[in-house]
Amino acid sequence: YLPGYRSGGPLRTLVNMVENLGDEFEFLIVTRDRVFGVSEPYNNVKIDQWNEVGKAQVFYASPLMFSVTGFKKILNATSHDVIYLNSFFSPHSTGAFLLLRRFGFVKTKSIVIAPRGEFSPGALGLKAAKKKIYIQVAKLLRMYHGLIWQASSEYEAQDIRNIMGSIARVILVAPNLLSVAPAV
């Protein structure tokens, strides 16, 4: 999440969702305390604490907290109705959380997963063998059963169906929201 910048479109989509819907819903976001692949944390945020960022509360997790143990601690300490996972191929966040859920370490009512184009033929072609193995293991472990899938378009919904089959029973198509103009 902000102040990150490397994830491009998916980050803008999340920021726009929070800023458009933040008066109606409370957003608690858990993210890394640094740009992915960088060793130094952000210098303008409180690490391993909640920070107010726009219309969201953001927890910038240190490497120790951005782990299975840390996620378990954060999830069990917060009240939430829905968990929104902003990636499919993220073993350190989405995968870790879904394993906790699968083996009963965290309880949650609803989970929405947004693959953000990760199932398009072009995206699947990059590191194809690794992704194919990840998908097969995830299916075998039933990590993605019972989720609500969010697609940005009908094309993306079809890509999800093509890869996940009957596992993706509920797919909601919700186009990306536009930026909110800053208040004057």
Which stretches of residues belong to each language-model region?
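N-terminal strand-loop element at the rim of the active site
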Residues: Y1, N20-F66
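Nucleotide-activated donor-dependent transferases that construct or modify glycoconjugates
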Residues: Y1-S7, L11, R116
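Carbohydrate-associated surface elements
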Residues: D33, Y155, N176-L177
